[in-house]
Amino acid sequence: TGMQRYLDVSTQIYKTYLKYVSPADIYPYSIDEVFIDVTGYLPYYHMSAHELAMTMVREVLYNTGITATAGIGTNLYLAKLAMDIVAKHIPADKDGVRIAELDEQSYRYLLWNHRPLTDFWMTGPGTVKKLEAHGIYTMGDLARFSIYGEDRLYEIFGVDAEILIDHAWGYEPCGMAEIKSYKPSTNSISEGQVLTCPYPNDKAKLIVREMAEILICLLYTSPSPRDGL
């Protein structure tokens, strides 16, 4: 099936990354997206982060024909935004490859005035609605508000205010070791799709099967314990 092909190619791409870094330094964020901590590998390969990313992306393209996009950041949050927002607005090279980079300073320069706020990782519509009710429409607004209104942010968002403030300034205290060692209170995962119209039974069964295959892949690549599965 098309989904099986998708899973096979995703596995092949993951194996390509493993030629360059240890599994301990890769976190599968989704079936087609990973975080990779290359910090310790740059001296070994005598490459910059951009050069190493380009090397891996080129090999993925050669092996699979898939054009990968990469975001490079000084922390996980900035790497995610570099890929999700910045890379979409830069020209691709001759092979269609886009690689974008962010550090704290370039993040503030490039994205403090970016809208909508929902483009930012972990900033959903509900959070944005509350922020806009207080005149906060950009990450720059949020950063400036946090200087004098930090207590008010904690009143509105509780402990979640801390991560909002950190992200407004381009900080992310959570690193690869923390997300690898995180143990959720439950061991459940889920997959969902929003259908644009009613589906007949045969097509609905195909969608359910594809989602089940995605869950299988996530279980296989997840760093969480699998005892009892």
Enumerate the language-model features and the residues they cover:
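Gly/Gly-Pro- and Ser/Thr-rich, intrinsically disordered tail segments characteristic of DNA damage-repair
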Residues: 1-166, 176
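DNA-contacting surface of Y-family translesion DNA polymerases
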Residues: 119, 127-222, 226-229
